[in-house]
Amino acid sequence: MDKLQYELQGYLEIDRYRKQRFLYPLLFREYIYALAHDHGLNSSIFYEPTENLGYDNDNKSSSLIVKRLITRLHQQNHLTISVNDSRFVGPNRSFYSQTIPEGFAGIMEIPFSVRLVCSLERERIAKYQNLRSIHSIFPFLEDKLSHLYYVSDILIPYPIHLEILLQTLRTRIRDAPSLHLLRCFLHEHHNWNSLITSNKSISIFSKENQRLFLFLYNSHVYECESVLVFLRKQSSYLRSISSLAFLERTHFYGKIKHLVVTPRNDSQRTLPLWFFKEPLMHYVRYQGKSIMASRCTNLLMXKWKYYLVNFWQCHFHLWSQPGRIHINELSNHSFYFLGYLSGVRLTPWVIRSQMLENSFMIDTAIKRFDTIVPIFPLIGSLVKAKFCNVSGYPISKSVWADSSDSDIIGRFGWICRNLSHYHSGSSKKHSLCRIKYILRLSCARTLARKHKSTVRAICKRLGPKLLEEFLTEEHEIVSFILRRTRLRNERIWYLDIIRINGLVPHS
């Protein structure tokens, strides 16, 4: 066990001799701010593009402002100034709170981006700019999940205090002035501790310093997930065997499949170590959460859960409650994933087998990955947006009644198209049809409220125009490509659904 801990510590220390010690002087280089503003250094391979998360790219960086900033940095030692100093507030507050963190974030990305590019080039991975975690989610759901037994839904823990985040970052970057400046930026945002402990998406961060917060969040997640790579490499050394002598006879044949003998060295071959062979564990991260799925038993899944919780608490001082990590058996329970109720169902099939003159009817069951649109959370979102009441009865959107008819119809149609686009991966579309019906009738009631008329009169006057706005454009394109398939029951996944539907509750 001590040897394993030593190897883990050595793994976590890999590449730390390459720590960047002189990042702070780059703040005095004008080209750094140009690169940061243009999102250079291939920053899109480190995390999702910030423009997709609401980052404002319309404000052009002025070279004159940057030169004035560098001059002030030379004249004043901001690292010794309190955050509450008057020079940090007042008319120049936005100047300091946006320009400096933007350039600072670009500087902090340098060691991570260089390390990532080198590792990808070493593995000979081409077109790595297009790599996204979203690209691996849907093939995993379709190809792997139906063959697994248990799944664990995990909320990635957040640091309870920003100093813990800085200590974690200090293991990768040894530059005291830069880290002290980062501490000033974080203390300037008094609501940082409330942001890192909330369950909302990273996109809730203020737009002015969003790139810096995205970098900090991704570096934090990178450290939390580093142990998973180490454990995967360790488990690859275990070798499966056909038979073994085992003293305990309880559930003998069930346990014999998960046993392996690993000799320590040549002199200790007579004293083998007995391990349970850990089956392959699948890990997928999305929107601040992650799932772990495997073919292993419930006992081994529970061991994984408590190991991760204890590791996060002891190594990173991250508080995670074991009771909030649920282990579900896929054949009996569904889990909430990306706005879907997902699970594995046994689908009965009747197979006709012909052998010479005799035919046989064979009843069998095939595991099938199933995704269902949850109706009640979506209706709850519609109630919150005031499209219907708690019973699902459509009501008029009074705040839109002053807009033009085309604007009202366009807004409702846009919501319906996004819903159809997002939930195109559903196995059954009945719940989605009900939601679209509520929105269509709510649109008609809004128009009737505006014209002081009835819903029947509005539908008769607009005719097909009201219905056409609620048809999805991509459905027509896909139906042209896949003419021979039944699109009603076909799952079609789109890679941009994470940021499409604001009505989907992700908590």
From Swiss-Prot:
Keyword tRNA processing applies: yes
Signal sequence annotation = none
A Pfam entry, by short name? Intron_maturas2
Question: Keywords for this entry?
Answer: Chloroplast, mRNA processing, Plastid, RNA-binding, tRNA processing
What GO terms are given for molecular function? RNA binding
Q: Does the keyword Electron transport apply?
A: no
Predominant cellular place of this UniProt entry's protein: plastid
Q: Name one GO cellular component term.
A: chloroplast
GO BP terms, alphabetized:
mRNA processing; RNA splicing; tRNA processing
User: Where's it found, cell-wise?
Assistant: Plastid, Chloroplast
Function statement = Usually encoded in the trnK tRNA gene intron. Probably assists in splicing its own and other chloroplast group II introns.
Homology family: Belongs to the intron maturase 2 family. MatK subfamily.
**What is this protein identified as?**
Maturase K
Q: Which organism is it from?
A: Euryale ferox
Organism lineage reads as:
Eukaryota, Viridiplantae, Streptophyta, Embryophyta, Tracheophyta
